[in-house]
Amino acid sequence: MFDLVNCLIFASVILILIELIAIFTVNIVNKKFQWLIISKDQIPKLSDGGLKKFFSHGYDPVLGWIRKPNTSHSEQSGNKITNWNINSQGYRTNLENESLPNKISCFGDSFTFARQVNDNETWEYYLSKLTNTNVKNFGVGNYGLDQALLRLKREFIKNKSELVILGVVPDTISRIVSVWKHYYEYGNTFGFKPRFYLKNNELCLFKNIINSESKFSNYHLNLNKIQNFDFFYSKKF
């Protein structure tokens, strides 16, 4: 009887240790492997410091995020450091070309914005040289085609041009069924956005539900609506 009790105690200890090791391993791997979703990922805590920086440089209540006028950023990739600047009109600085007439405007995501190159290395900069015009770059990283179109609608009123270029890559299209980027790009917890959807064969707009800075602290109150309109929630979470 004594041996049986000892065996049961030993087996219980082993099972507890295995469970603790599994929990520890899952939490470690979860930080690097975005496809491993655990309970804390359902309602992640938003960094106060990160939000403060996001509000000053990138938050937009309608579009979700934007490159704000008169902001700049440096980014390192390997041994290369690149810099970008946004001018007072809200598009990427086009240096000496800004004095030229504007006939072309560009909208889209980071491929349009030309991330990881300097202001004098963007394809809009070279297109400006080829056309002898000021090609305005309104691209924003992580945008879906929906956000690019809404940005076009906003900017075209005061930045009319003869030609508009919409930059599209596969992810630009995938993002149109996303409402919270965290569900599509794990960890992108500040990225709440609008999206279009079809209702009775008509195109309708689901507006950005986190449309004020104060709503970030209580974003969980809107999770049901967000999840209902986010295609990737059901696929990943």
What kind of feature is each model-predicted range?
Residues 1-14:
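N-terminal Sec-pathway targeting helices
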Residues 29-130, 227-230, 236-237:
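Membrane/wall-proximal cationic-aromatic binding patches
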Residues 128-149, 154-157:
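A conserved hydrophobic secondary-structure block that centers on an alpha-helix together
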Residues 27-61, 146-237:
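Interaction-surface signature
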